[in-house]
């Protein structure tokens, strides 16, 4: 909550089987915990909690954004899907199905826009070498939708006013 643009980050407490929503604390730890996939990366210890990837319990936290910020409009991006039935010899997929809860990837048209990317079989969890491809795909998709987004999200704060607020924020930093 102390950032210029308030931020939320979702991780998972697998011991207590619940999501954790970070609104304060160490930003680096929160972001790192939110993408710590079990069996691939070690958990991040935050307080007494071993935190893992937030996608285990909430892979599309639009509900968190609605609850904490009551936004007029949400721009969502779906890059994964709920698990398919795993094959008998795919132990990792079986464990993933055991621990991951299904996510609701829906936004009402009046409250937002959802960008869907069907990447099944094309990009895997550890395909870090495809980051530029994914960035370019997301950028191109956003450009295709930008006119419809601008129609629904007019600028509500004049740019000069926003810049003054940014400068005041920067001056308040230690």
Name what the model sees in each region.
Residues 1-174:
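Patatin-like phospholipase
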């Amino acid at each position: 909550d102390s950032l210029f643009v308030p931020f939320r980050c979702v991780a998972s407490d697998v011991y207590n089987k619940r999501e954790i929503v970070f609104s304060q604390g160490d930003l680096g730890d929160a972001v790192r915990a939110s993408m710590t996939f079990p069996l691939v990366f070690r958990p991040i210890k935050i307080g007494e909690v071993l935190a893992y990837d937030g996608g285990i319990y909430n892979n599309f936290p639009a509900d968190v954004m609605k609850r904490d910020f009551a936004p007029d409009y949400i721009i969502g991006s779906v890059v994964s899907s709920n698990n398919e039935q795993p094959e008998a010899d795919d132990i990792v997929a079986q464990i993933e199905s055991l621990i991951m809860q299904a996510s609701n990837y829906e936004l009402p048209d009046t409250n937002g826009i959802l960008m869907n990317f069907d990447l099944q079989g094309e990009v895997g969890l550890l395909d870090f070498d495809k980051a530029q491809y994914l960035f370019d795909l997301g950028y191109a998709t956003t450009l295709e939708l930008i006119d419809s987004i601008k129609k629904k999200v007019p600028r509500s704060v004049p740019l000069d006013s926003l810049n003054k607020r940014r400068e005041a924020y920067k001056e308040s930093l230690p």
